[in-house]
């Protein structure tokens, strides 16, 4: 009763992914977050599978992020899984996690499309003031070659990455409040 199978397996998968996120970059130079974290759709780093894989990744700078996410999953998810059943709970978990990813993409689109537009406008007008919100150390006499401009634009677009299943966890909290 304390660890229904879906909750137990989700916790195991999340812990294994967290450990892989720590060890693989050091041992094999494989950046799990870069590959499987959710990137902005306008970035070259975006892949559709990231809507699912990002839910199993967590901040590696401290174990606290992982612990509190998994504690919340266990604390509230176990009762929902027992009440709804395995399949309904798992569908709900993925639905809320993917939904949170879609909302994150919409927020990024609002933010990052402005940056992309500013870079494109600079390419045609050479008005450096357009880039001041996005780049530091610019003067009115700064000139950025087009090739470098495109590199900077991609760096900004690909810098946005999300990890963790906070959306799924908030969905579980909502469901818990409803039952």
What are these model-predicted stretches?
Residues 1-179:
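A detector for small-residue-rich transmembrane helices and their helix-helix packing motifs
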């Amino acid at each position: 009763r304390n660890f229904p199978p879906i909750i137990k397996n989700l916790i195991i998968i999340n812990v294994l992914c967290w450990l892989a996120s720590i060890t693989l970059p050091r041992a094999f130079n494989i950046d799990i977050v870069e590959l499987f974290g959710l990137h902005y759709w306008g970035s070259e780093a975006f892949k559709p599978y990231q809507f699912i894989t990002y839910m199993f990744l967590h901040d590696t700078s401290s174990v606290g992020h992982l612990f509190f996410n998994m504690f919340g999953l266990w604390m509230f998810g176990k009762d929902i899984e027992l009440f709804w059943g395995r399949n309904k709970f798992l569908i709900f978990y993925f639905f809320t996690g993917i939904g949170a990813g879609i909302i994150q993409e919409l927020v990024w689109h609002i933010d990052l499309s402005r940056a992309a537009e500013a870079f494109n406008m600079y390419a045609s007008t050479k008005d450096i003031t357009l880039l001041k919100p996005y780049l530091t150390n610019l003067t009115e006499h700064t000139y950025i070659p087009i090739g470098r401009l495109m590199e900077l634009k991609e760096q900004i677009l690909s810098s946005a990455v999300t990890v963790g299943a906070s959306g799924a966890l908030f969905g579980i909290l909502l469901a818990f409040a409803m039952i």
